[in-house]
């Protein structure tokens, strides 16, 4: 397989714009005039076939100057030659190579700069960003890429030159290709390593060697001689200095920086006075041309100042007699500058500083050189680093095997690029080749600057031949016919001055790889001559040339080849990713949503999560949802979370939900919560849920919650719960309550309770409640609970509750919870709820309670209760109570009570009882006295009265009336005995 890479070098034209306004009094005519001085932008239209016709300074050539940069290349599409907003510049006519001299008509020599870019695309049509192919006209190539491979704004700069040294603009490009002699079906692509990110970036890439030596000749180096005038650099005023470039400069892709200067000339300036522009040693003003010049500063068709470059690379301008007759002169200068390969040899950051006198500007940029191309064990890169159009010579530097791989039977050939009108002359007479061996690949500079004295000259140890026309061959004979170190090949060649073609060179490296496959890799360097072109950019492009017919054979000049590349790729990827995240979020959301969802999900999940979140959210949501979901979930989660949340929510929701879930949960929860909530809730929910859930959760949470909610809820719930709880309760409560209660309750309860309670409670309660409740409750509860609870609560509540609840719940719950909680709660709730509850609970409770209660209550109770209770109670109670009660009750009770009671009652009863009791009771029951061991209950202890509108029962026979009378007398006797005992106790006190 063969791969080809192209490199392109660009030639930059220099322009200097100078604006000067002069106001003077013309005594002879009595007129005032002022003029703005601008830098001249001289266009060169000279071709290699020079004519001897002399040109005069006519007005037409001057008037065309302001548009020089846009029109000097009429056939091209480049926009790089714009004037960049500089002041208008008068154009001097282009000079041909003649003996005529004129100090005011300077010509322009274009400044080439190396531009390189690498690509691995093979034989593809070029896009505007990759405009390079063997059949592309050089002028079009340059202009298509002038604005796309450089990071800088386009600019134009004129340069000074004597008429006899006028040259054409030059653009240099480079291309590489690689090839191999594998079977046709096994063509291999060339992995190109051209991304700047693949290179190590050093912090400072400037060569510290001093003094700096320029690799070009200086035109009119007059600054080193004593100047006749005065240096007025520090007398210039309104000095402005800027450096324009991107953050990264790619020297091998025609990258450059733009230096801008503006200033005002003092009125005291005279002919011969000078000023200096300092250019940093990291930059040069010539690019790849051998001669560097600066253009004069023009004021219309007059020269304001002439510039030269001194031996240190700085620019010295000398004013002409123009300033003797003018005042208020201003000037603006723009110059492109290129990275100096001798002083910046590696990729890295460089700080550039330039200025006029004490007025300077600095900018740090990343200099990024392109790496060589590599194909299997073959690696090569070439660059044209110098062009001398005066002597028609060029210099090409080629790195052979810069990777230091093992290559068997290595050979290098150089020839013209096929299908191009290359003007290079390659033969023994016009081509001189030097070969240097590099012992350590790290000694190669990335800028392709070569100091021959640093390497061993092995030219006499290699075989150099010219086997074909316009072709040279270099063989690297060694003892074992293989090389493992890099070599540098320097080609000093000539250009045919009579040719109208472009400089286009191909270097091809041959050799066997480790599998003894004969391979080749090519690198193309191309120079395009563009008359009057401001800039030219080049990119690298790989192509696949024809392979040698036999292993070891060196191809002469390859013919045209067409290929249709295609690619078939398939990828199979397996990725394993893990994430650990912590989030801190603050959100304020308002949503209005209505959703109707019907979902059925069956999920089995096990999650272990450790999360810490700090969230502050305020949400205002109005949602109405109708959801019908059936979910069967089996989840086991172990979570340890600490959350601190402050939320204020105002929610108005109406939801109609029908869900059936099967849940079996075992949770072990250790939570410490500090909650401060102010909730105002208004919710209307109609929920019918049948849940069967099986979950095993171990939760340790520490939450600090401050919530403000406004809730209005209307709930209709139908739940079926079966609860089996075991609780052991030790409570210490201090309660002070002041309650004003008005209740109207109609209760029908049938309870079968077997309780043995040992309660020790100390309660001090202070509550102020205003409650208006209307409840219709039908409950059948069978409770078996064994609870062990240790709680310490301090509660201060102020509640105003108006509830109308109708509840029908059937719940079957099996929970095993181990909870240790400490809560500090301050809540202010305003709740209006309408609930319809139907509950059927089966409770078996075994409670051991030790209660020490100190209660002070001020109770004003007006109750009208109609209670029918059937109670079977077995209680053993030790009670000390003092009560002040005003009750009016209508009670129909049938109680079967078995009570073993030891009662020590100290009662100080000062009661003002106004009881209005209208009791019509009819009983067909077998009532057991209160001391009966079974089936005894006290209906007056239940606040579950129910107004009955049924007709009064039949009073029965006379015998039943007599029995009632007897029991009435016995009750009266018992009452007298009771009041007597109380009176005796009072007298004792």
Curated annotation (Swiss-Prot):
- PANTHER family for this protein: TOL-PAL SYSTEM PROTEIN TOLA
The segment annotated Ligand binding A region runs over 40-542
Compositional bias ranges of the Low complexity kind: 47-65, 106-132, 143-162, 566-598, 918-936
Annotated signal sequence is 1-39
- Protein's job: Cell surface-associated protein implicated in virulence. Promotes bacterial attachment exclusively to the gamma-chain of human fibrinogen. Induces formation of bacterial clumps, which diminish the ability of group IIA phospholipase A2 to cause bacterial phospholipid hydrolysis and killing. Significantly decreases macrophage phagocytosis possibly thanks to the clumps, clumped bacteria being too large to be phagocytosed. Dominant factor responsible for human platelet aggregation, which may be an important mechanism for initiating infective endocarditis.
Checking InterPro entries in the record gives: Adhesin_Fg-bd_dom_2, Adhesion_dom_sf, Fibrogen-bd_dom1, LPXTG_anchor, SDr-like, SDR_Ig, YSIRK_signal_dom
The protein's name is Clumping factor A
- What is the residue range of the motif LPXTG sorting signal? 952-956
Q: Where is the composition biased (Basic and acidic residues)?
A: 943-952
Kindly state which keywords UniProt assigns to this record, in alphabetical order.
Answer: Cell wall, Peptidoglycan-anchor, Secreted, Signal, Virulence
Q: Name one GO cellular component term.
A: extracellular region
Species assigned in the record: Staphylococcus aureus (strain N315)
Please verify whether the record's keywords include Nucleus.
no
